[in-house]
From Swiss-Prot:
The lineage of its organism: Eukaryota, Viridiplantae, Streptophyta, Embryophyta, Tracheophyta. InterPro entries: AIR12_DOMON, Cyt_b561/ferric_Rdtase_TM, DOMON_domain, UCP037471. It is a single-pass membrane protein. GO terms for cellular component: membrane. It is found in: Membrane. Coiled coil: none annotated. DOMON domain could bind catecholamines. DOMON domain could bind one heme b. CDD domains: DOMON_CIL1_like. This is Cytochrome b561 and DOMON domain-containing protein At5g48750. Residues 176-255 form the Cytochrome b561 domain. The chain crosses the membrane at residues 216-236.
Length: 255
């Protein structure tokens, strides 16, 4: 009976030490990167970024000396009755002032429409209009529940960090662009993008910080009550029978 209990104790310690390793391995296996994507039109880009929300990816090629930025914003797992948008805000980190590229599929003809629109308020009509910088080769495609916008933009030379945002929403009757959702990831789809390194730096809101604190608190409780306390109790019960381990079992218990 004693040997069986001791075996259980050693097994629990073993699982506690190796569980994070198994978790990381599983996470790495299921993670999908934008590097493996091939475009149907044969386009190639030097860099790509897995955006943190809305099943989105940004592929781009940037020439710092000339300011030419060639992009492909790709939104996966999206219905054909939806619109997508990607934009850069040259003046702030928010929605107002964003210079956006939009696309949707015409409900009658089935052809894709891509155009530009400057956002000047919180309830924009997203009507077509010029941007504050030059845009060429604007197009879009929809295939296998995946919508993509292609464009080439010209920025001031030596621009390295930009504020960008991305979004999607429903397509209403008459191909009118409906309002995007006002909760969850739809309020988190904006970040700073370093065009040289490809690093995306998101801005966390107060609610996000509180959610993080709650998550950490729950994790600490689960580890303490589910792992440390049972190990301490078992150490105090079984290890103290060995005189050579005295007072090691006591220190394990109080830890």
């Amino acid at each position: 009976m004693f040997l069986s209990s001791r075996t259980i104790f050693v097994g629990l310690c073993f699982l506690f030490v190796l569980a994070p390793c198994f978790t990381r391995a599983t996470t790495n296996e299921v993670q999908v990167s934008c590097d493996s994507h091939n475009f149907n039109n044969g386009k190639h880009f030097r860099s790509c970024v897995d955006l943190p929300v809305l099943d989105s990816f940004l592929h781009y090629s940037y020439v710092r000396e000339t300011g030419v930025l060639e992009v492909a914003y790709r939104h996966t797992n999206i219905e054909s009755s939806s619109w997508i948008a990607w934009g850069i805000n040259p003046t702030s980190k928010g929605m107002i002032g964003a210079q956006t590229l939009l696309a949707y599929r015409n409900s009658t003809s089935g052809f894709m429409r891509a155009y530009t629109s400057s956002i000047n308020g919180y309830t924009p009509m997203l009507q077509e209009g010029p941007l504050s910088f030059r845009v060429t080769q604007l197009s879009a495609e929809y295939l296998n529940r995946e919508m993509t916008i292609f464009a080439t933009m010209v920025w001031p030379s030596n621009t390295t960090v930009v504020n960008h945002l991305w979004q999607d929403g429903p397509l209403k009757e008459g191909d009118r662009l409906g309002m995007h959702a006002m909760s969850g990831n739809h309020l988190k789809s904006m970040a700073n993008l370093d065009l040289l390194s490809g690093q995306v730096m998101t801005t966390k809101a107060a609610n996000d910080n509180m959610l993080l604190v709650k998550s950490i608190h729950g994790l600490v409780n689960a580890v303490c009550w589910g792992i440390f306390i049972p190990i301490g109790v078992m150490a105090a019960r079984y290890m103290r029978t060995y005189k050579g381990l005295d007072p090691t079992w006591f220190y394990i218990l109080i830890l």
